[in-house]
Curated annotation (Swiss-Prot):
Protein family according to the UniProt entry: Belongs to the MoaC family.
Catalytic activity: (8S)-3',8-cyclo-7,8-dihydroguanosine 5'-triphosphate = cyclic pyranopterin phosphate + diphosphate
Residues holding substrate: L66, T67, H68, M102, E103
Top-level EC class as recorded in UniProt: lyase
Stored Gene3D superfamilies: Molybdopterin cofactor biosynthesis C (MoaC) domain
Name this polypeptide is given: Probable cyclic pyranopterin monophosphate synthase
Gene encoding the protein: moaC
InterPro entries per the UniProt record, alphabetical: Mo_CF_biosynth-C_arc, MoaC, MoaC_sf, Mopterin_CF_biosynth-C_dom
Amino acid sequence: MSGAGMVDITAKEPVRREAVASGFISLKRETVKAIREGRVEKGDVISVASVAAVLAVKETPRLIPLTHPIPIEKVEPEVRVRDDGVEVRVRVATTAKTGVEMEALAGVTAALLTVWDMVKSLEKDETGNYPDTVITGVKVEVKRKG
């Protein structure tokens, strides 16, 4: 086969599937304090990042071209502020013919990017760059089938 195409899953049976993905964004201590105290100009970072995760999970086939559009039955974002940044975990579940790890990863990355967007004015240095802001450790922690 040349080019690109979706994997044929027509012969597969729908089964329960679950995935958990996680990631982290390093932030300045002053930024973390502003998040905790609710002083971020754009609003509630935790709530908006959580909603971004849910939206990204549901929109994964529009973001990643060769993923299958599958019914999403459960999305549980967990956004936790730590002293050195924000940790995100997203659990996704469905009953389908293919897994939901890409959906979980999409949720995590969208949440982390949303955090960055919401705090970028606090993270910029005097040159307008982000030397302390780093997204790391994006991974699938769990993938279950059946």
